[in-house]
Amino acid sequence: MTSTINKPLDGEGSVQVKQDPKINIEEGALVIAVYGKGGIGKSTTSSNLSAAFSKLGKKVLQIGCDPKHDSTFTLTHKMVPTVIDILEEVDFHSEELRPNDFMFEGFNGVMCVESGGPPAGTGCGGYVTGQTVKLLKEHHLLEDTDVVIFDVLGDVVCGGFAAPLQHANYCLIVTANDFDSIFAMNRIVSAIKAKAKNYKVRLGGVVANRSKDTDQIDKFNERTGLKTMAHFKDVDAIRRSRLKKCTIFEMEPTEDVIEVQNEYLSLAKNMLENVEPLEGNPLKDREIFDLLGFD
């Protein structure tokens, strides 16, 4: 006797978070999800990219999707309360909240929200992200937004933290020119390829970060069909900007700082005008092991 096993739909047979069809970000906004290995500089990249978009005259919203809620502090110059903390204070009666309870204005008018997350080992971060978008929609805070950036926790690609991919047009992957970062990037490419079957999200490209060279990234890109959209070398001014709790656009305009600022502005312009949706083809783990390294 034989039986047929049907392929599960998105979110079936797992702990994935299904997207509520009523929770969508308005058409017309450019929505970018930023992923990458933990500690690779996603929040720095996201915040400086948000600042760059604002410099181009765009209305920008950055949503931090990490329980550490440290995505936006270089924009706001402080640690802001999270959506989940604010909702708990009103017993999750969102109608009692005002926009300034959970959304904070940062550098050059960038609006900042930290979704936060459940305590470690409990709940689902993807649910929190969905509730954050729902709250923003209830208060009509997405209607006039030009660019939305999701800054996502580490390299977790479970259904929960893949939730921003359900809203995004493009995903940018931040990586360094090393094995561990590229290995994590490959896993993220796999997640995006899976989500792209059911949602509009596509790969926007790679951001090379904290790397003098990009030879290993270039090898991976050539094999998988990816493209480097920006390259940020290991510039001390970027590290110092984090310590000063500000964006790179607020630093003293030295030659290094201006070079980094121009690279962020170029990335923002390309995401607005010249981004080409990429069809990434992830490698098997053994293939990455054999590909990377010195000949």
Curated annotation (Swiss-Prot):
Binding of [4Fe-4S] cluster, residues? 124, 158
Going by the UniProt record, its keywords in alphabetical order are: 4Fe-4S, ATP-binding, Chlorophyll biosynthesis, Iron, Iron-sulfur, Magnesium, Metal-binding, Nucleotide-binding, Oxidoreductase, Photosynthesis
Q: In which pathway does it act?
A: Porphyrin-containing compound metabolism; chlorophyll biosynthesis (light-independent)
Q: What domain of life is recorded for the organism?
A: Bacteria
Q: Name one GO biological process term.
A: photosynthesis, dark reaction
Give binding positions for Mg(2+): 43
Q: How is the cofactor bound?
A: Binds 1 [4Fe-4S] cluster per dimer.
**Catalytic activity, EC:** 1.3.7.7
The residues listed in the UniProt record as binding ATP, with positions renumbered to this chain, are 39-44, 68, 209-210
Q: Which cofactor does it need?
A: [4Fe-4S] cluster
Q: What InterPro entries does the entry give? A: NifH/chlL_CS, NifH/frxC, P-loop_NTPase, Protochlorophyllide_ATP-bd
- Which catalytic reaction applies to this protein? chlorophyllide a + oxidized 2[4Fe-4S]-[ferredoxin] + 2 ADP + 2 phosphate = protochlorophyllide a + reduced 2[4Fe-4S]-[ferredoxin] + 2 ATP + 2 H2O
Which GO molecular function annotation, any one, does this entry have? metal ion binding
Q: Top-level EC class, please?
A: oxidoreductase
| Function in brief | Component of the dark-operative protochlorophyllide reductase (DPOR) that uses Mg-ATP and reduced ferredoxin to reduce ring D of protochlorophyllide (Pchlide) to form chlorophyllide a (Chlide). This reaction is light-independent. The L component serves as a unique electron donor to the NB-component of the complex, and binds Mg-ATP.
Describe the family membership recorded for this protein in Swiss-Prot or TrEMBL: Belongs to the NifH/BchL/ChlL family.
What is the annotated quaternary arrangement, including any partners?
Answer: Homodimer. Protochlorophyllide reductase is composed of three subunits; ChlL, ChlN and ChlB.
Report the HAMAP family cross-referenced here: ChlL_BchL (MF_00355)
State the protein's name.
Light-independent protochlorophyllide reductase iron-sulfur ATP-binding protein
According to its UniProt entry, this protein's organism is Prochlorococcus marinus (strain MIT 9215)
